[in-house]
C-alpha cells in the first residue's frame, strides 16, 4: 500500500496522519503528527484464539528519550522499564479500547505506541490514543471503533480542549475524556474542588471534541481500511447451557443472595463444584472433554452474571441486601500505629485500607526525568494490594499496572487539598495498605489517607472522601448503584469513582464495559456520589474534627529562612565545604532551593536553632547606623580592622576612634579587644567604615572667661622663618582594606 497522508486542524494545532510507509507488516499502523509530537502506532493480532477465560489485550506506550533530545538516565544509558507516567498513559489508552471488542473475542491483540518526537505543547498521549484507535480501525482486526480522547482544562472560567503546557499549569481541571461518537466510555480527572455542574459541562464539551476526531478517523478508514478478518469467538454449547440452567439455576440464585461475602462465595462455589463434578463424570471419556468442561465453567459464570443483574434491575435487590443508594457500614480510626508520623484505618463493609504518613525533608522529593523537563515531585501516594486482602494466594513483587493506577488516582484526589510548599515545606508520602477488599479499595485508600494527613498535622484545606458508583443496564433500563462491592463491579457495566470535599470534586475515574453512557446517567451518578461523599465526610469529621495543630513527636521538625540568591554560594561554600561543616556540627539536614529558601530539618529543635543562627550569620549584611559589638582583628597605622560578625570586617579609622587626637592606634585598642562600633558608611564595593567615637559623648567646647576672652591654652612654639620643622607623615594606603 502506497503512502497516504491525511490532514486536519484540531484544537488549534495541525493533525497529520500517515499510512502505508512504515511498519507495514503489522495488521495496522499509522504515524500521527500532532503539533511537533510524533507517535508511531502498530496493532497486531495473533492468528489463533488464546487459551484462558479473558481477552488478552496489551497496550504499551513507549517513551523514547531521543524524542525530547535527552539521554536516558542510569548507568546503561538505555530505556528500561516504563516510567510511571508511561504506565498510566498505557492504561488510559487501554480502557476506552477494551470495551470495543466483541464478547467472546479471545485472540491476543497488542497495540504498541512509540513516541518518536515530543512537543510538550501538543499532547503525545492523546496522539497515541488517536493512533491506537485508528491503527485498529484500518486493520483487519475485528474492532468495533473508532474511539478518540481529548484532554480538557478549565482556565479563567473557560473550558479548553487539549490545553498547552502554560494553560495546563493555570488550569483548575486536568481531565481526559474518551468515547465513541455516541457516548463517553472513559474518564480520568483531577480537579481543584470543582462542582458537579462544571465537571459535567467539561465532560460533555470534551465529548463534542471527541466526535470531531472520530469523524476524521472515519474518513481515513473509508480510504485505506482493510476488510475485517473473521475470527472464532468463544461460544458455549446451547443445549448444554439449557440443561445446566434448568437443573441448577435455582440453587445458584439462592447462593448469590447470601449477604456476607465469604459465605456467598462459599455457597456459589459449592454449586459450581457440584455441577463440575457431575459433568466431569458424565464426559470423562469424551474426546472433547476439555472443551465441554470449559463450556461448563463459562455457563456457570454467565448464570451468576445474569442472576446478579436480574436481582438489581428487576427486584432492586443487591447481593448484600442494600438499597441501590445505600453505603455499607463505615468505620474510621486514627493513630492506629505508634512511631509513624500519622496513620488512619478506614473500613467500608468488607473493604479496609490502612494509610501511613511519612514526612521528610525536601531533599527526599522524587526526581521525575521523562520527556518533559526534569522536575521534583513532592507528594507521593502509593497503593499496595496484597492477595491476602481477598483471602487468596498470588504473586508478590513490584507493583503492577493496577496498583500504580490506583495509587495515582488517590494522589490526584488528595493533592488538590495539600498546603503549599511555603506553608508546609515537607516532602509527603502516603502508603495505602489494602487489608481487606470487597470492591472500591482505591476509594477507601483516599479516605484513610485523609485520616493519616489530619492525624499527622498536615494542614490540608479540607477532608477528602471517595465513593465508587456502579451501573447495571439492559439497554432500555438502567440502575445506578452507590458504593459497589466486588460482585457488582465484576458483573456490572460501570465503575465510576468520585472523590472530593464538601466544596467540590477533586478526582474522577470511570471505566465501563459497555460502549458508552449517556449524559443522563452521568448526571444521576454524580448526584448520588455527592450524597454518599457527604455521608462519608460526616464519619471522618466525627472521628477527627480538624487537623492536629502539631506534628507527631517522631516527625522531623523544620524551620526555614529566606536568603538572597547571590548568598547561596556563601552558605554552600567551595565544594560544599561550608554546608557540610554546618551539618556535621549540628546534626541537621539542610535543603536550599534555587530561590534562596533554606529548609533546616531535625528532630532536635536546639540543633535547628543553632544551624539557623550559623546560616543567618553567614548571610548577614551590615547596615549603616547599626551598632555592633566588634572584635579588633588587625591594627594598621591608619586605623584598626574590627570583625562585626562572621566574615564581615570594618575599618575604624584612627580619626574615628576618639574625639581627642591620637597618633598611635595602639594607645586606644589592641588586637583581641571588643569594642562597640557604629557603621557610618558602606561604599559601592561593599567596604565598610565604622566609628567608635560616634558612640561616645562629644566633649564640651572650650570655655570663655568673664571678659569674653578665650581661656588660655598652650601656645604652639614659634619657629624662625628660616627654620622649617620636620614634617611627620602618616601612611594612608590607597585601599584601606
UniProtKB/Swiss-Prot annotation:
GO terms for cellular component: cytosol. Residues 691-737 are annotated as: Disordered. It catalyses: RNA(n+1) + phosphate = RNA(n) + a ribonucleoside 5'-diphosphate. Its EC number is 2.7.7.8. Residues 556-615 form the KH domain. It comes from the Bacteria. The keyword Flavoprotein does not apply. It is found in: Cytoplasm. Residues 625-693 form the S1 motif domain. One of its GO terms (biological process) is RNA processing. Its cofactor is Mg(2+). CDD domains: KH-I_PNPase, RNase_PH_PNPase_1, RNase_PH_PNPase_2. SUPFAM superfamilies: Eukaryotic type KH-domain (KH-domain type I) (SSF54791), Nucleic acid-binding proteins (SSF50249), Polynucleotide phosphorylase/guanosine pentaphosphate synthase (PNPase/GPSI), domain 3 (SSF46915), Ribonuclease PH domain 2-like (SSF55666), Ribosomal protein S5 domain 2-like (SSF54211). Residues 715-724 have a biased composition (Basic residues). Mg(2+) binds at residues 489, 495. InterPro entries: ExoRNase_PH_dom1, ExoRNase_PH_dom2, ExoRNase_PH_dom2_sf, KH_dom, KH_dom_type_1, KH_dom_type_1_sf, NA-bd_OB-fold, PNPase. It is an enzyme of class 2 (transferase). Residues 700-714, 725-737 have a biased composition (Basic and acidic residues). GO terms for molecular function: 3'-5'-RNA exonuclease activity; magnesium ion binding; polyribonucleotide nucleotidyltransferase activity; RNA binding. Belongs to the polyribonucleotide nucleotidyltransferase family. This is Polyribonucleotide nucleotidyltransferase.
Amino acid at each position: 500500500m502506497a503512502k497516504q497522508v491525511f490532514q486536519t486542524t484540531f484544537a488549534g494545532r495541525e493533525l497529520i496522519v500517515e499510512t502505508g510507509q512504515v511498519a507495514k507488516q503489522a495488521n495496522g499502523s499509522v504515524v500521527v503528527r500532532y503539533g511537533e509530537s510524533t507517535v508511531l502506532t502498530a496493532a497486531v493480532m495473533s492468528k489463533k484464539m488464546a487459551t484462558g477465560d479473558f481477552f488478552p489485550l496489551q497496550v504499551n506506550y513507549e517513551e523514547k528519550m531521543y524524542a525530547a533530545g535527552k539521554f536516558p538516565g542510569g548507568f546503561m544509558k538505555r530505556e528500561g522499564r516504563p516510567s510511571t507516567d508511561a504506565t498510566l498513559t498505557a492504561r488510559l489508552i487501554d480502557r476506552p479500547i477494551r470495551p470495543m471488542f466483541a464478547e467472546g473475542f479471545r485472540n491476543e491483540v497488542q497495540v504498541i505506541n512509540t513516541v518518536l518526537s515530543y512537543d510538550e505543547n501538543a499532547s503525545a498521549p492523546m496522539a497515541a490514543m488517536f493512533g491506537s484507535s485508528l491503527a485498529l480501525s484500518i486493520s483487519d482486526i475485528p474492532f468495533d471503533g473508532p474511539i478518540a480522547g481529548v484532554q480538557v482544562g478549565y482556565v479563567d472560567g473557560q473550558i479548553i480542549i487539549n490545553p498547552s503546557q502554560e494553560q495546563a499549569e493555570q488550569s483548575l481541571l486536568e481531565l481526559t475524556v474518551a468515547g465513541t461518537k455516541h457516548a463517553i466510555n472513559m474518564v480520568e480527572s483531577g480537579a481543584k474542588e470543582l462542582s458537579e455542574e462544571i465537571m459535567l459541562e467539561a465532560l460533555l464539551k470534551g465529548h463534542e471534541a471527541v466526535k470531531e476526531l472520530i469523524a476524521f478517523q472515519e474518513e481515513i478508514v473509508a480510504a485505506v481500511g482493510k476488510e475485517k478478518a473473521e475470527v472464532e469467538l468463544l461460544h458455549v454449547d446451547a443445549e448444554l447451557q439449557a440443561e445446566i440452567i434448568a437443573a441448577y439455576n435455582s440453587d445458584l440464585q439462592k447462593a448469590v443472595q447470601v449477604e456476607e461475602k465469604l459465605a456467598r462465595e462459599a455457597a456459589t462455589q459449592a454449586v459450581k463444584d457440584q455441577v463440575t463434578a457431575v459433568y466431569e463424570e458424565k464426559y470423562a471419556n469424551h474426546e472433547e472433554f476439555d472443551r465441554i468442561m470449559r463450556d461448563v465453567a463459562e455457563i456457570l459464570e454467565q448464570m451468576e452474571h445474569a442472576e446478579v443483574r436480574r436481582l438489581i434491575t428487576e427486584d432492586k435487590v443487591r447481593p448484600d441486601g442494600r438499597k441501590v443508594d445505600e453505603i455499607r457500614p463505615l468505620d474510621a480510626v486514627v493513630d492506629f500505629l505508634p512511631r509513624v508520623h500519622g496513620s488512619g484505618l478506614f473500613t467500608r463493609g468488607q473493604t479496609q485500607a490502612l494509610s501511613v504518613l511519612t514526612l521528610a525533608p525536601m531533599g527526599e522529593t522524587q526526581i521525575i526525568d521523562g520527556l518533559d523537563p526534569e522536575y521534583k515531585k513532592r507528594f507521593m501516594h502509593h497503593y499496595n494490594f496484597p492477595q491476602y486482602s481477598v483471602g487468596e494466594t498470588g504473586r508478590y513483587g513490584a507493583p503492577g499496572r493496577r496498583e500504580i493506577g490506583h495509587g495515582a488516582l488517590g494522589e490526584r484526589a488528595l493533592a488538590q487539598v495539600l498546603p503549599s510548599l511555603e506553608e508546609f515545606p515537607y516532602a509527603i508520602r502516603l502508603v495505602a495498605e489494602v487489608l481487606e477488599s470487597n470492591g472500591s479499595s482505591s476509594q477507601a485508600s483516599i479516605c484513610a489517607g485523609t485520616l493519616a494527613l489530619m492525624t499527622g498535622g498536615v494542614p490540608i484545606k479540607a477532608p477528602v472522601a471517595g465513593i465508587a458508583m456502579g451501573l447495571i443496564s439492559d439497554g432500555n433500563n438502567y440502575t445506578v448503584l452507590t458504593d459497589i462491592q466486588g460482585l457488582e463491579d465484576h458483573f456490572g457495566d460501570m465503575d465510576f469513582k468520585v472523590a472530593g470535599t464538601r466544596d467540590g470534586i477533586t478526582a474522577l475515574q470511570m471505566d465501563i464495559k459497555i460502549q458508552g453512557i449517556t449524559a443522563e446517567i452521568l448526571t444521576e451518578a454524580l448526584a448520588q456520589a455527592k450524597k454518599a461523599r457527604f455521608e462519608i465526610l460526616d464519619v471522618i469529621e466525627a472521628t477527627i474534627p480538624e487537623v492536629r495543630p502539631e506534628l507527631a513527636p517522631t516527625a522531623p521538625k523544620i524551620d526555614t529562612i529566606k536568603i538572597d540568591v547571590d548568598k547561596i554560594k556563601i552558605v554552600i561554600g567551595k565544594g560544599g565545604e561550608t554546608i557540610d561543616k554546618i551539618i556535621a556540627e549540628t546534626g541537621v539536614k539542610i535543603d536550599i532551593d534555587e530561590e534562596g529558601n533554606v529548609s533546616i530539618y531535625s528532630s532536635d529543635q536546639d540543633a535547628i536553632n543553632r544551624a539557623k543562627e550559623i546560616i543567618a550569620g553567614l548571610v548577614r549584611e551590615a547596615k549603616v547606623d547599626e551598632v555592633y559589638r566588634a572584635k579588633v582583628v588587625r591594627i594598621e597605622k591608619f586605623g584598626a580592622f574590627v570583625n562585626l560578625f562572621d566574615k564581615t570586617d570594618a575599618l575604624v579609622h584612627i580619626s574615628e576612634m576618639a574625639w581627642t587626637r591620637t597618633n598611635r592606634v595602639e594607645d586606644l585598642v589592641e588586637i583581641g579587644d571588643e569594642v562597640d562600633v557604629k557603621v557610618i558608611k558602606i561604599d559601592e564595593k561593599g567596604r565598610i567604615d565604622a566609628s567608635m567615637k560616634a558612640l561616645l559623648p562629644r566633649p564640651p567646647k572650650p570655655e570663655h572667661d568673664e571678659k569674653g576672652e578665650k581661656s588660655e591654652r598652650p601656645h604652639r612654639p614659634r619657629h624662625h622663618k628660616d627654620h622649617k620643622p620636620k614634617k611627620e607623615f602618616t601612611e594612608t594606603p590607597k585601599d584601606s582594606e
